[in-house]
Swiss-Prot record:
Subcellular localization: Cell inner membrane
GO biological process: protein insertion into membrane; protein transport
Gene name, Swiss-Prot/TrEMBL: yidC
Record Pfam families: 60KD_IMP, YidC_periplas
Gene Ontology molecular function terms on file: membrane insertase activity
Protein name per its UniProtKB record: Membrane protein insertase YidC
Spans through the membrane: 9-29, 384-404, 458-478, 516-536, 556-576
UniProt-listed HAMAP family: YidC_type1 (MF_01810)
PANTHER family per record: CYTOCHROME C OXIDASE ASSEMBLY PROTEIN COX18, MITOCHONDRIAL, OXA1
Keyword field contains Manganese: no
Species of provenance: Caulobacter vibrioides (strain NA1000 / CB15N)
Location, primary (coarse class): membrane
Amino acid sequence: MQNDNKNTLMFIVSAFAILIGYQFFVLGPQQKKAEAEFRAKKAAEQQSAAKAGVTLDANGNPAPLRLSRDAAKALSPRIEVDTPALSGSIALKGARIDDLFLRKYDETTKKDSPPVELFRPEGAEHAWFADFGWAGANLPGLPDSRTVWTAAPGQVLRPNSPVTLTYDNGLGLTFTRVIAVDDQAMFTVTDSVKNNGTNGLQLAPYATVQRQGISDALGKNQIVHEGAIGVLGATDEQKLEMAKYGKWKKDKPLQSFDSVGGWTGITDKYWLAALIPGQNQAIKAQYRVTNVAGIDVYDVNFLGPVQVLNPGATVSQTTRLFAGAKTVPLLRKYEYGATPAPAIWEFWNKTKAEIPRFDDAVDWGMFRFFTRPIFNILEVFYKLVGNFGLAILLLTVVLKLVLYPMADKSYESMAKMKKIAPEVEKLKAKHKDDPAKQQQEMMALYQKEKINPMMGCLPMLIQIPVFYALYKVLTVTIEMRHAPFFGWIQDLSAPDPTTMFNLFGLIPWDPGSLPLIGAMIAHLGVWPLLYGFTMWLTTAMNPPAGDPIQQKIFQWFPVIFTFTLSGFAVGLVIYWCWSNVLTIFQQYIIMRRYKVENPIDQIIARLRGKTAGAT
């Protein structure tokens, strides 16, 4: 019995040693070879694609290929993609997903606007596509971007109607690719390889999302992340890994990550192309920027583990591709799959996500804990009223009610300070040569009247995080894009389209075309002017600043902020304007309670006086 135990123990130790040794001395080097082969293969394909069919410039260097979109599409036979959310095609050359339009989103708010373009074929300017395949050390005949796959005629990719592509390399390997799509934005790509030969092989699956050049506008917005993005790392240590276009190219052109599952891709402000491997699969992900024939190529890819393919056997790999708009409900639907997603306030809920932190594809910013709840509240209000502009007004009212006790004390303090302003001026005149005595007497007066002079700053300090959160939400969430309000406001995420400098559109002239000042006056429309008036009224209802220079500065604040905010999203201007109106109403009630003279009563008195005079 004792010998049996010893033998069993020796067997376990030996088996474990063999397993570790095989992993270290065989599979490890094979994985590295496969990885090197994959990187070399992709680099060679980029060089070949960039140089194929191009002319030379004056220096003898290859000039970048600049085909029209239709001409680039015509370089390959195609299979149509037709879903409720997507239209486009798959190239049989390379079996790439490289031609997609988003049916539910238009480029502009005009009625005849074309749909948003997501993917564009290689060869056209600013190409963007997804690629899949296999890499292996010293294996000839693996399909690449130039391989033309075979498909049965008449196939169309639709929900519940996948397409099948095949390729026989003539060297004993048969490759099959089955591409399926749902009715929203998720592709499922299943690759399989059958070994019809007599020798065993080692293969590693890969997937990549690549952009060949970007427009000048991308990556310039400091508020929004655009570039590489992913949630990568060990299962319990996954982090959001981001690389903005500019910094990615300049500071970190090559970044590598070891991960188990997760996801990675390339994002714009509103659109995302993300690769999602099996969540139990160990992968090596990479963010890479190279320059090929003058074009910056942005590449996000992952390489899966080496798989042994014995004679007569088949190996397979399934990768998902999200290609669409970053709508938060859709991202959370994919994040949790069939499991109901926990509510955002259920921080105690430990429901495991199928795609970890997928809704972080939306750039909530460093104050996610505040920005995200603001969006959720707006979304709830939108479902109630059916308009995001009204939802913003409703959110403002709710915030005012929540903060009412604190704000009430602040406005009460401000009203009292305005009431004793004449006494403060007398103290300043009396002790103008003794600042210490002046300060002492003023503090005594404040104590007597039970006034805290610092309370006046509280309303503004409270609004700062709300302002930031709403600004972020209006900037990064696609739900706000092209969201109308009323009248001329058709996009809450864009500045007011009118300006007083062309009489709000009556004169056919664009003030934005003026040099230097055009950007400042191009959107000085109705809502920014309403905001300026409400800010002036709010300032007038506050107690005057103690210092004359400060008084002059505060008088100019409404003008300065009117010009500044005119270039912001009009939804933000509407929020601030409505917030000012509610503040004025609250202050007016408090000032009437304490019988303090206020500008509203002065305006009403003047209007009555003029009316009486006219009568």
